[in-house]
Amino acid sequence: MAFTIQPRQSLIVYTYSLKQTRQLKRYGTVMYVSKKMRYVVLYVNREDVTKLTDQLTHLRFVKRVVASSRPTINETFNGVAAEMVTTTETEDDDE
């Protein structure tokens, strides 16, 4: 039996009140709670994101749910510095 890493994604849940944040533990792992801005960062399995987003939006204390875009962002930065140098040189030539 081989161990496989479960792909996970974060959901940012904006709430009207933080009194019900304990209820969000049913849906995933609560990683962070912002008291000032009233949002909760919740980690869930990636295959359950759409189903849980629908369930969370129907809760009375939830304003909106935003899925994190981190899985779609390219995290390899090879050649980024070279690209920035060439773009700044072309911008300087235009002026």
UniProtKB/Swiss-Prot annotation:
Q: Which domain of life is it from?
A: Bacteria
Q: Name one GO cellular component term.
A: cytoplasm
Major location category of this protein = cytoplasm
- What keywords are annotated for this sequence in UniProt? Cytoplasm
* Compartment list: Cytoplasm
RNA-binding as a keyword of this entry, yes or no, is no
Please give the family membership noted in the entry. Answer: Belongs to the UPF0298 family.
- What is this protein identified as? UPF0298 protein LVIS_1401
Which species expresses this protein natively?
Answer: Levilactobacillus brevis (strain ATCC 367 / BCRC 12310 / CIP 105137 / JCM 1170 / LMG 11437 / NCIMB 947 / NCTC 947) (Lactobacillus brevis)
